[in-house]
């Protein structure tokens, strides 16, 4: 098997993709590099669908290897441990923009594994892995609506910098990861934005740096499209060099368009009325009532198409809500796109803890509890990063009663 590669300049960074050298048994295998950071990304999809699968079984794993940073794992056994928080977040970052890009009805079990082989502590591996995963899926012949490209945009000294190094990020006020896909017109559609202020944001703004206003952030997103397009073109260039197999993948149809059309004709106006109810509980109850009526009306006892009816009904509800927002400018609870929920907060709820507060936004509540400790209680970190401890720890719990449901506590 020949080795093929392609390189692309993204700002000051050079990103290289190579295939045909490592993991030759994986249908989609890509080694991606930037600086001295190297990641192997493999993609494998089964050719058949498991019995009883009614969802798309996509898994993304990020494997950080301690040797990539020249370290030996801690602990008695000196073995690689469980995934770090950073690796878990990288998995989610890869999953979010890629999952919607698969063709509707594709249910074959698909696995993406990103193994960090080397890190230079200047070029982060997450964006590299995301782009390589998109490329690997194409090399494996998996049915995608479009390739996906992604970049990190950082607001440094009042200018947007693409793929900034970790040294440059120390002066950043605002960072965001922007992912996009190519639409039929050849333009970039943004499919994901993950953004947030940096640890140095307040200090930098106090020193005179521009705050990330809505217009500034919009400019950064718009600027990212050029680089996303270049990454997608690089992926296409490498795919064109390879003999990508044409596979007749099984595509599952959840429901027929005829069934959806019949349900829409019979219950479309009632669904529109139900979605205009601003009270959440009342709206949910009315939606369930209409769904039961749809099942009763269109049930085929010989085929038992209950599931198909419910999925078609759900699709109609989704389209109704979307159309209502786009055409009428009203969301489910009656707010316009620019309105926010009522916000309030209380403090000192609990008598013996160091600090407590209750934050409310609409019907959403968050109870926060703070505990202060000595510096020796810092969390020790055994990761590939240069940071070896963490003094601020934020634990998030989401019990089932938060959404009025009952299921096992994990």
Where are these regions (language model features)?
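Alpha/propeptide regions of enzymes that mature by internal proteolysis
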Residues: 1-4, 10-13, 27, 38, ...
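Short glycine/serine/threonine-rich phosphate/pyrophosphate-binding segments
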Residues: 25, 124-130, 147, 172, ...
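Small-residue-enriched alpha-helical segments and adjacent helix-cap loops
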Residues: 73, 77-79, 93, 111, ...
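Glycine-rich, flexible beta-strand/loop modules in the N-terminal catalytic cores of phosphate-handling
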Residues: 26-112, 116-123, 189, 194-206, ...
